[in-house]
Amino acid sequence: MRFSVGLGKEGAEERLARRGVSRRDFLKFCTAIAVTMGMGPAFAPEVARALTGSRRPSVVYLHNAECTGCSESVLRAFQPYLDELILDTISLDYHETIMAAAGDAAEAALHQAVANPDGFICIVEGAIPTADNGIYGKVANHTMLSICSDIVPKAKAVIAYGTCATFGGVQAAKPNPTGAKGLNDALKHLGVNAINLAGCPPNPYNLVGTLVYYLKNNAAPEMDEFNRPLMFFGQSVHDNCPRLKHFDAGEFAPSFESEEARKGWCLYELGCKGPSTMNNCPKIKFNQTNWPVEAGHPCIGCSEPDFWDEKSPFYES
């Protein structure tokens, strides 16, 4: 199923306008993506060109063991809404959550997209159960392990979206009876080298920024030791936290209900994992509105490997 008709170079503004997206809103969105990529507002025109170019890549979005929160994060993005822009920039040919097709028709759409002679980008959400040959997770009577083993190596670019897909997430928490693994770990024998966009949930602007980078450069961005793009994961949450001045001053909230917490004092002594967590949450926030620490909740380190085990307990008293 194709959800988009494409923007193309000709009439891009007119197509956006028909969907209720003004030129101002579009450029505001492009500026936000440019800032997320660490390029600054001056890079916004390049983002706009990438998003309205004639190349409209086919995208196959696979679901494994997950809660669909990563998809929800993308679908609830605004300025503009996803269906007003992103689905006109890519050809989303398979996504189990939002596609109209079901059953055999959905399976046919998947295989048709994979057979696209121009290739496709594969986005993977969710951990892959690997124990007992992957029998603990199936779609259409095929194990998630076998589906990913078949589809993912054929893609020209692969993005693991969310901490479950990147590092296994909660499914991989001890004792991990299903043998859940992140994509690169589960398929390392096939040479899969996915771009890891960690987070629980991940920020949709990081996904758009990655797609923009790929559309412009036909290559993956520079990544860290965990295959996370440095333009999003190059600094710790602590480095850009609005409460950093209180940390430096030794001002720590003693409890969540304290006056100090209401004044915005540092949450480190209440369990905040910001100093050991690489992510750009403070820079872009969610929907450019808010993020956990600013809302009064400690960072739980959700973009780090094995955070359910390694970062717990999430709170200190």
From Swiss-Prot:
GO molecular function, one term: ferredoxin hydrogenase activity
PTM comment text: Predicted to be exported by the Tat system. The position of the signal peptide cleavage has not been experimentally proven.
Alphabetized UniProt keyword annotations: 3Fe-4S, 4Fe-4S, Iron, Iron-sulfur, Metal-binding, Oxidoreductase, Periplasm, Signal
Enzyme class, broadest EC rank: oxidoreductase
Free-text comment on the cofactor: Binds 1 [3Fe-4S] cluster. Binds 2 [4Fe-4S] clusters.
UniProt subcellular location: Periplasm
Binding site for [4Fe-4S] cluster 2: H238, C241, C266, C272
Domain of life: Bacteria
GO cellular component: [Ni-Fe] hydrogenase complex; ferredoxin hydrogenase complex; membrane; periplasmic space
Binding partners and assembly: Heterodimer of a large and a small subunit.
The protein, known as: Periplasmic [NiFe] hydrogenase small subunit 1
Gene behind this protein: hynB1
